[in-house]
């Protein structure tokens, strides 16, 4: 395939387009942008769809432009939200922008020979507006009827929460972003999630009104699981892309646990794997001799390498193999100390751990929520100390449980593990 739109359609990226002319447009190099709001100091797994969309365009020779919303982030996008977001101050937003930029730099190529990626902050062009000048120069270009007709606006206006004037103006800011990029950078296409359709068309309509020229929008489906829930969240919260917020091991583990019903779709949308290989895994999963989690392992390897790099993937695999319950891998304190930076760990006083019941330790480390749950897991053979199965409900922590007198690797089932650092007075 020589056209990026064909690839995106085959992989399930396209939810809607403002015009089918986009395919013809992409036969020549263009500039395409997507915006990222700085609501946190890291993007999460759900945002990876947008980054991959930009990355696919770049692979076909188009220039990806990432907008980090230093201005729009202060307003808060109402799209898909039931209530108004808490507004962030400028200092917090600047901190978040740095983290998000690192996420983008890990995946997009900023040294591409013909189409290097660009990161821009929309505060750079909004900060020079006064309220009066913005109303005069930008506000007059928008009409209330189409603004009120946007689904994101109608939903909020009909809710008990209502909608503030601040949020109502968000689509004006995003629409002006597109106009500014069109005029100053030659950007002609905007990417966004399906919940961004109204904001994207605000921009395409504005460009047509001001310049009588076409601009285009593409929306992709929001990343969801087969049960309809948003993908990118775990029991502990968002699956962050930044290693400072989530280790490569925990990131890898989240992907290994993906349900069979979701893995092929995630391969299509979150990896650069060839479609032939993806179809091979899809067929393999239907075979009677399929080894469970084979496809998930391939998925986890690809996405972890993409987000955390080759070294991050090596660490994730090493930790996974080293702390697997029942693993024959020899554990020593030095190895565990290194692993502790990439998996859940805690510190406890040695005197408070020795001679403690294992059931109590499971609860104190929050690997189990109650003693009754801990007992049940022990009876079912799901508790391990230093990779060795423990089935005695009355097991007491002794010096024999310690690695080099200072560490314990405790596991509750295959998913939940904890390295306990033992501190002497």
Swiss-Prot record:
A Pfam family reported for this protein in Swiss-Prot or TrEMBL: tRNA-synt_1b
Record Gene3D superfamilies: HUPs, RNA-binding S4 domain, Tyrosyl-Transfer RNA Synthetase
Keywords: Aminoacyl-tRNA synthetase, ATP-binding, Cytoplasm, Ligase, Nucleotide-binding, Protein biosynthesis, RNA-binding
Entry coiled-coil feature ranges: none
Record EC number: 6.1.1.1
Gene Ontology molecular-function annotations: ATP binding; RNA binding; tyrosine-tRNA ligase activity
Highest rank taxon of the organism: Bacteria
Record domain S4 RNA-binding: where: 356-422
Binding site for L-tyrosine: 33, 170, 174
Family the UniProt entry places it in: Belongs to the class-I aminoacyl-tRNA synthetase family. TyrS type 1 subfamily.
Name listed for the protein in its UniProt record: Tyrosine--tRNA ligase
Gene name, Swiss-Prot/TrEMBL: tyrS
């Amino acid at each position: 395939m020589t056209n990026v739109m064909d690839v995106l359609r085959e992989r399930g990226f396209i939810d809607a387009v403002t015009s089918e002319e986009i395919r013809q447009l992409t036969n020549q190099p263009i500039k395409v942008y997507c915006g990222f709001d700085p609501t946190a100091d890291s993007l999460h797994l759900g945002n990876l769809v947008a980054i991959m969309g930009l990355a696919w365009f770049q692979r076909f020779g188009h220039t990806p432009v990432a907008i980090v919303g230093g201005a729009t982030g202060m307003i808060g996008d109402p799209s898909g939200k039931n209530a108004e977001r808490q507004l962030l101050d400028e200092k917090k937003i600047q901190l978040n922008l740095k983290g998000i930029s690192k996420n983008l730099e890990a995946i997009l190529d900023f040294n591409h020979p013909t189409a290097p990626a660009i990161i821009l902050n929309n505060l750079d062009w909004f900060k020079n507006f006064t309220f009066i000048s913005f109303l005069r120069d930008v506000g007059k270009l928008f009409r209330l009827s189409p603004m009120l007709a946007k689904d994101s606006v109608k939903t909020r206006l009909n809710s008990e929460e209502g909608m503030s004037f601040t949020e109502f103006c968000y689509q004006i800011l995003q629409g002006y972003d597109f106009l500014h990029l069109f005029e100053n950078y030659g950007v002609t296409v905007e990417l966004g999630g399906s919940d961004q359709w109204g904001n994207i068309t605000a921009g395409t309509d504005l460009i047509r009104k001001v310049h009588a020229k076409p601009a285009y929008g593409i929306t992709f489906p929001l990343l969801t699981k087969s049960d309809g829930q948003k993908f990118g969240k775990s029991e502990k919260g968002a699956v962050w892309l930044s290693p400072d917020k989530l280790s490569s091991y925990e990131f890898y583990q989240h992907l290994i646990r993906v349900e069979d019903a979701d893995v092929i779709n995630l391969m299509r949308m979150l990896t650069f794997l060839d479609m032939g290989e993806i179809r091979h895994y899809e067929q393999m999963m239907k075979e009677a001799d399929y080894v469970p989690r084979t496809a998930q392992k391939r998925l986890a390897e690809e996405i972890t390498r993409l987000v955390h790099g080759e070294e991050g993937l090596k660490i994730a695999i090493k930790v996974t193999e080293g702390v697997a319950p029942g693993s024959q891998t020899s554990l020593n304190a030095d190895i565990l100390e290194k692993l502790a930076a990439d998996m859940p760990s805690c510190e406890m006083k040695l005197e408070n751990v020795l001679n403690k019941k294992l059931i109590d330790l499971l609860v104190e480390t929050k690997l189990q929520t109650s003693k009754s749950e801990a007992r049940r897991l022990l009876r079912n053979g799901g508790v391990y100390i230093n990779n060795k199965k423990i089935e005695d409900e009355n097991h007491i922590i002794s010096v024999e449980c310690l690695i080099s007198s200072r560490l314990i690797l405790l596991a509750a089932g295959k998913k939940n593990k904890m390295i306990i650092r033992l501190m002497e007075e």
